[in-house]
Regions:
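GT-A fold catalytic core of metal-dependent nucleotide-sugar glycosyltransferases
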Residues: 81-135, 141-146
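N-terminal anchoring/stem segment of glycosyltransferases
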Residues: 1-73, 94-97, 145-147
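A conditional alpha-helix N-cap/helix-loop micro-motif detector
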Residues: 13-16, 79-82, 171
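Short, surface-exposed amphipathic charged segments that create phosphate/polyanion-binding patches used
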Residues: 70-80, 137-140
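Catalytic core and acceptor-binding pocket of nucleotide-sugar-dependent glycosyltransferases
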Residues: 149-210
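Amphipathic alpha-helical segments that form well-ordered structural scaffolds
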Residues: 18, 22, 49, 88, ...
Length: 210
């Protein structure tokens, strides 16, 4: 049994509608206890729509911004939404002692994701190693082991905060800090977190021929 998690505001509801409908159409709901949706700026009509789905639980956040932006401007609105993802994922993991799957709200479920999850790993990260840089992307993340998942989140969040100090103008912090965190943990002889891969060819459209 798993819980699911995503972040959504009104500007992304065009994607959120596809996300939730495709989830209910193409994924085995018997394997899902709760679908947690972090509200970073949903309108009343958005909330009303999402609450029609029986497994959905809305989580209030400390952000109420219905718009979005690109990643680069100072005080980027988009970035404010993204930075809540790891923070509240960790809170949900602590709250409900079940494995947790995070899928970005601008994704669409085309088949059952659970057949691609390696249960032997403590955490699973989305591997796109065909890229020349940043072999892992933060759009799909799984914590199978709650305690070690929280430890991984702690390391990831700490690395992200450090990256924001080191390179404040880069804009995209989430995936790059994830890559730095993974490399550091894999090179740490004291690390006890087993990190596995979920490949983009199975959970993302980047390698699918349409």
């Amino acid at each position: 049994m798993y819980n699911l998690f995503t972040v959504l505001n009104s500007a992304y509801m065009i994607f959120g509608v596809v996300w939730i409908k495709s989830l209910y159409e193409n994924v085995d709901l018997n394997k899902i206890k709760t679908i947690y949706i972090l509200d970073t700026g949903l309108k009343d009509k958005d909330l009303q729509f999402l609450k029609e789905f029986d497994k959905v639980e809305i989580i209030n956040s400390d952000l109420n911004e219905t718009s979005t932006s690109d990643a680069l401007p100072k005080n980027s609105i988009w970035l404010q939404h993204v930075l809540r993802k790891t923070k509240y994922f960790r809170k949900v993991l602590r709250k409900d002692d079940l494995p947790l799957v995070m899928v970005d709200s601008d994704c669409m479920f085309v088949s059952d994701i659970f057949e691609h999850l390696d249960l032997e790993s403590d955490v699973l990260v989305c591997n796109r190693s065909y890229k020349d840089y940043d072999n892992w992307i933060a759009s799909f993340f799984v914590a199978n082991n709650v305690d070690k998942g929280i430890k991984f989140l702690n390391a990831w969040i700490s690395r992200m905060k450090l990256l924001m100090i080191e390179q404040p103008n880069r804009g995209w912090f989430e995936s790059h800090s994830l890559n730095l965190c993974i490399e550091e943990l894999k090179n740490d002889p004291k690390n006890e977190i087993k990190i596995g891969d979920v490949f983009t060819k199975n959970v993302a459209c980047e390698e699918i021929s349409c």
